């Protein structure tokens, strides 16, 4: 029986190395390949991770430096390559659009020479622009391309609410949708805990102060840049988000998760990639869910689409 599971991670900097190590932590692969223009960095990260496999608690995963030839027989390819926002910079991922779109074109040009069967998980920012480019420019099966999208914002949102109500964040339901970035929005109409809708939680959890939706939304957008400015980068949360998708694919879980892909008429939107709930399984994205949104939430979804389309137009991407 062949239980081989090969994952290629393109980009070995802060995010790529974190993804590789979380893959090992959760025993999601038998082989992890790191590819980077800086081969010394990729070699060092792979070697460091391989040393950890000697620990009694670790799985004997093969870590190594690779190249695009490794994509031929990969099950999953995770793309993290490209510059990101640095401490002190203007907090707008969309300003990276032109630069990273060119990088994605180069990376995908190499991948499609070797495979059109691997699941591709996008992390590179601006995430929705990168996902759109990869999905529309290379005749790669769209169901096999997803961006981590607002999965990370959803994790952050659930943590914020959990802290306010003193409950396990895994008991919080609800999505952050739209753009992975400044135009992300909380779909409050999907939010609740333990079977109670969001509007009942203050009373049920005995909060003395009414929850401010606006304050939560502001914190949700700002916290990523606070982490960047204080830590220098974000990598742990996004690595966990990527591994959630990897697990759903490898175990054919049919999990419904918010992720980025090209919209094909959902909410009356086309020709942009945005995050909405989608079912993810061994065949990639199996279906999308046009969950009911309030008029205000629907307006925010369309504003997110306009934001991403503006970035695409600015980069000359149709």
UniProtKB/Swiss-Prot annotation:
Phosphotyrosine sites (modified residues): 225
UniProt enzyme class: oxidoreductase
Organism superkingdom: Bacteria
GO molecular function, one term: L-lactate dehydrogenase activity
Protein name: L-lactate dehydrogenase
Catalytic residue positions: 180
GO CC annotation: cytoplasm
Cysteines paired by S-S bonds: none
CDD domains: LDH_3
Positions that bind NAD(+): 13-41, 125
Pfam family, one: Ldh_1_N
Gene: ldh
Catalytic activities: (S)-lactate + NAD(+) = pyruvate + NADH + H(+)
Pathway: Fermentation; pyruvate fermentation to lactate; (S)-lactate from pyruvate: step 1/1
Record keyword Ion transport present: no
Subcellular localization: Cytoplasm
Binding site for substrate: 93, 125, 156, 234
Lineage: Bacteria, Bacillati, Bacillota, Negativicutes, Selenomonadales
Annotated organism of origin: Selenomonas ruminantium
GO BP: lactate metabolic process
PANTHER family the UniProt entry points to: L-2-HYDROXYCARBOXYLATE DEHYDROGENASE (NAD(P)(+)), L-LACTATE DEHYDROGENASE
